[in-house]
Amino acid sequence: MARKTPLKRYRNIGISAHIDAGKTTTTERVLFYTGVSHKIGEVHDGAATMDWMEQEQERGITITSAATTCFWSGMAKQFDEHRINIIDTPGHVDFTIEVERSMRVLDGACMVYCAVGGVQPQSETVWRQANKYKVPRLAFINKMDRVGADFYRVVEQIKTRLGGKPVPLVIPIGKEDDFEGVVDLITMKAIYWDEASQGMEYDEREIPAELQEKAEEYREYLVENAAEATEELMNEYLENGELTVDQINSAIRQLTINNEIIPLLCGTAFKNKGVQKMLDAVIQYLPAPMDVPAIKGILDDKDESEGTREASDEAPFSALAFKIMNDKFVGNLTFVRVYSGVLTQGSSVYNPVKMKRERVGRIVQMMANSQEELQEIRTGDIAALVGMKDVTTGDTLCDEQNVITLERMEFPDPVISLAVEPKTKADQEKMSIALGRLAKEDPSFRVHTDEESGQTIISGMGELHLEILVDRMKREFGVEANIGAPQVAYRETIRNTVEQEGKFVRQTGGRGKFGHVWLRLEPMDPAGDVLYEFKEEVVGGTVPKEFHGAVDKGIQERMKNGVLAGYPIVGVKATLYDGSYHDVDSDELSFKMAGSIAFRKGFMAANPTLLEPVMKVEVETPEDYMGDIMGDLSRRRGMVQGMEDLPGGTKQIRAEVPLAEMFGYATQMRSMSQGRATYSMEFQKYAEIPKSVAEAIISKFNNKDDDE
């Protein structure tokens, strides 16, 4: 089969935003204008096409990134038909992981901001992730029809808060109820969309007289920026003081792909104005798969050298599985982004991470919540494979004769845990299957069994994250569960350097046990990348080489279960520097025990302490409730980091608060502000716990031990 759309006319993009910036509505309009959905689904009615999970429709927020394909040839049909694959990303902080995994497979992104709320905390998180993966982006300032909308303030915030370089391509005509359309700064024409046709048609007119001066000022700023793209353009601009429309467009494309500027558009998706222009900008300024650097990976040779895969159908097949979902009709869906080559239905792929081959049963193209079966997928395609048995999010799929492992995605450790048990004993096995499937879909969600209590513990990125997963168990797998109180993932560490002896001796007739070591324990940064290091400095064979690994193992097992209060230990460098052995009685177990004993004693002597997860919390509240909210945050051991005035008499408070103090915060904050304040939080760092709080946690642990 030949390729239908040339690769240069592909755009793989994400639409990304803070919760409530109107991202789902924007995506809906995109699907409407590109002809995919004939009835516009409103989030307010719980009928949006991209929000296909029931909980998303209930909560009016987007949780999973559904991938949708659509086609666009421009507002005035001025382009050849382009294929746009859209990955819808969630805007709630508990789902940051979803954003991260979709950023990984995008070539470009549209950042949607609310003209009233501006740049919100989640916008900063998404921005950092886009920077990390060097994703070229353009921005769309939405909700221009809302009271308090201010285009120019949001432009300023993108500069100051995000450190981006926004270059407006349009400026708004009017605002709030009087928002009518935009001035196109490239063609210097006013554009008005026709409301009767839901914005499908538009007309160009002269710029309103009162905006002429402002339009000229912003046009000059645009042309100055465009001229910086190349030396030739700069010379042309200096000579003639102007550039042609084509020159401006190609310069902006180049600067956007190089991540030097953020082209800016505005409108109101709800009132069908401006999204059409944003789609044109996606085609004009965001990269095709071959415009971004070739994907890197590790080759399957003895040196594990780095290799790349060019975006071409002729190159060997390589793809990244970026999302796994369960569909009640077809079963397991593995969403993949194809970076190179071609994959046909019925052929096999190799998974170098699991070192397994798998046969591809069916390939489906997702249209929000309907599917179209495909015979093959090619470079640049985003589609779902049906029935893959052993693929996890982040795995590579490639040609078995040309193995490459694409960069793995890194997922943060969970910060909150809950005990869960099925409401009826009969559901125990069903619950295990359900949790296993959910953990496969979402690497930031972990499941384990507590060895002491035998309880099933689930861990994730926030209360909402776990709440939704428990809810999905009930809806998708029919398992109702009881959940325990949330538990915080504390850590233990040391503050001083110590040297400690550890001896394990059992000699009572016959063959005994003998292990003897000296360890030096030193503190490392518990927030660093390396959380444990084992070094050997044994001189003269006092501890034979073959037992060094056993000492390391003994230490690591002890670190897993903690010493102070049963929490994992981090930030320790252990050096084995001396000891002794017995020709007959020494074995691996003896040295493993000796290592564990020395570590436990040394840990208690090295001024140990507990660490707790501290969250970055941002609260937006009307000024009247400011005092109560600040007082409440400081009662929760919060440290206020800064405050800012927002429009409409709203204040934003930024604080760092221990996670342990944030349980039930939403309810408390609502009652203090009569439901008018909102907040968001995300993990910031691990920090030392104050002595009085730590003592309470440790004594609780010791009492539990005594009871047992």
Swiss-Prot record:
It comes from the Bacteria. The keyword Protein biosynthesis applies. GTP binds at residues 17-24, 88-92, 142-145. GO terms for cellular component: cytoplasm. The keyword Cytoplasm applies. It is found in: Cytoplasm. Its main location: cytoplasm. InterPro entries: EF-G-like_DII (IPR053905), EFG_II (IPR041095), EFG_III (IPR009022), EFG_III/V (IPR035647), EFG_IV (IPR047872), EFG_V (IPR035649), EFG_V-like (IPR000640), G_TR_CS (IPR031157). Keywords: Cytoplasm, Elongation factor, GTP-binding, Nucleotide-binding, Protein biosynthesis. One of its GO terms (molecular function) is GTP binding. Residues 8-290 form the tr-type G domain. GO terms for biological process: ribosome disassembly. Belongs to the TRAFAC class translation factor GTPase superfamily. Classic translation factor GTPase family. EF-G/EF-2 subfamily. Catalyzes the GTP-dependent ribosomal translocation step during translation elongation. During this step, the ribosome changes from the pre-translocational (PRE) to the post-translocational (POST) state as the newly formed A-site-bound peptidyl-tRNA and P-site-bound deacylated tRNA move to the P and E sites, respectively. Catalyzes the coordinated movement of the two tRNA molecules, the mRNA and conformational changes in the ribosome. This is Elongation factor G. It comes from Psychrobacter arcticus (strain DSM 17307 / VKM B-2377 / 273-4). The lineage of its organism: Bacteria, Pseudomonadati, Pseudomonadota, Gammaproteobacteria, Moraxellales.
